Amino acid sequence: MPNRNKSIFITSYKRERILLLLLKRLKDNLNYNQFNKLVIIQNGSKKLIKLIKKIDHDIRIIETNYSDKYSKFSKVNNNVFLGFKKCFEYYNSEFVIHLEDDCIPSYDFLNFFNEIYLRYKDDKKFYAINAFSKEFKLDKKFTYSKFIYGIGKGWGIPKEKWIFTKEKLKNILSSNIKKYFDSHLEWKIKKKYYVIMPYRSRVIEIPTNGLNFKIKDKNKKFYKDWKRSFLKSKKCLIEKYQYDPHMKYYWRKDCLKYNFYNKIIIYFKSFFK
């Protein structure tokens, strides 16, 4: 296998059909061959592994199984920790992306992450790149901005932030923990760093009655907006990604623009968290 300095890993649990669709969409990405690929399968099957290898024989696979004493939170957290640890410490990656198996990537998903990482990798305040959004304007396909927010639904971090992330994630790996990694990390990220968000979404979550979105949620306005925002068409030529410091973003009310005023607000709010 050729030497690659970037990786993407997918965590998967009982969503085989969507996982295979995800991998096929990912393989269509422009920068696909520049990334190591790892799939962490919880309670998987030999049949599924064969189907994954049929898509790409070079995809690495790790199988996990947990006893009943582990909470659903702890299983998710351990799988995520394992993925980052493997990619950073064994594959020696400079940048690592995590996707859950129900998040379908856009046609420029890897290109977006790659370009933004190269642009901000030397900024000590840069923590992560997120892939999600629910905004929509035709002329904003390749716009992004900086925000004081957490991570989730397709996110990537540089190696320099792995030490910080590793230390914080270790606190939620015990078997009886009842908190997911993204909510655990949120305020720790907000206090020190910014994250980058695209105006148009680079992922769409498929409702599956999983941990977050239920099948019934596909009819809600939030999900319809997210689906509209998703950059799914392959007909659009990839353009240069443009930073917009004034970009409006409404994923959640607490997703704040990265500026001096909001940093002060977050600093004082953090004492009550």
What are these regions (language model features)?
Residues 2-99, 103-273:
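Peripheral/terminal regions associated with large enzymatic or DNA-binding modules
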